[in-house]
Amino acid sequence: MCAKRGPRTWERVNANCRHKWNREIPTITGSRPDIDGRSHVHTATRPAPSRRPARDNGAVPEAMKTTDPHPLTGAAFGSPVPPGSGWPGDPADATTPVAHSAGGAARLARSAADIPALDARVSVCRACPRLVAWREQVATTGRRASFAHEPYWGRPVPSIGPADARIYVVGLAPAANGANRTGRMFTGDRSGDWLWAAFHRAGMAARATSRYAGDGQAPVGLRMGAAVRCAPPANKPTTAEKAACLPWIARELALMPQVRVLVALGGIAWDTALRVVRQAGWGVPRPKPHFGHGAEAVLARPDGVEVTLLGSYHPSQQNTFTGRLTADMLDGVLARAAELAGR
């Protein structure tokens, strides 16, 4: 156990040894506009490791003083990665407004003028205390051993892909040691390996692999987001967390009127897509279309343009290892998406 012996000195004591070290606890201040446009000063300190995540005080997190090299670029970053610190593909900077509540997320989403602004705001969102605590705990004290010396993104993961894409893929949520580490959708885990390989076979990705942000990977003709943008404990976001994240994807689709195909990876993504478009005033078949691999539902935008929703089993290890989802099955859904999109 640890006992405090002074403002900057801690002592670890057990039955066999006594180890003493000094640790400077950094205090970093910075100014950042909140959702109402006013400037607030936030102060962040590095907490002592704990099994229980620290309560979110509403401040935008700054990097820990200890840094680790990015596995590709070699640049040093703290974890979580501060906005605008040079991480490959980071859409935000120190001036990006931050949502601290579900209502704030909805207001910031609605006011985003374009896709780059939306991506930036997504990537610094702090609307859900449980998700903020979990993603940052994993990024600091809960890293997987094989990635212990890598910096962790530790922030919400924005969508990836061109704003003029005609295919939009909806995932579930970032993996704690995957996208929560790399900062890019479906990057750094087995599910991502499967998905990007399939994209590449379909001519929808620049490369067959996606390991790190900055590795040259990029979607071609498709854009990909998720129902929830933060890694959730046990991969299970709550109903309230899914609802709080909904405005981000709603605004994204509103800014992409050329989309003709939605591909839902799993039942939660399917339900999210239907809920988003129904709230946006799209025509949705009744009764509610049921999810299934290869399922199709024809939706109608308010202007009458048809958009097809396609279902695919999620490329989780549970599905791919058991054969519930095969490469041929995933290829079939993507081929159908390409056909419907006019590619």
Mark where each language-model region is.
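Low-complexity, intrinsically disordered or signal/transmembrane-proximal segments
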Residues: 19, 40-42
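A polyanion-binding, active-site-adjacent surface
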Residues: 69-299, 303-343
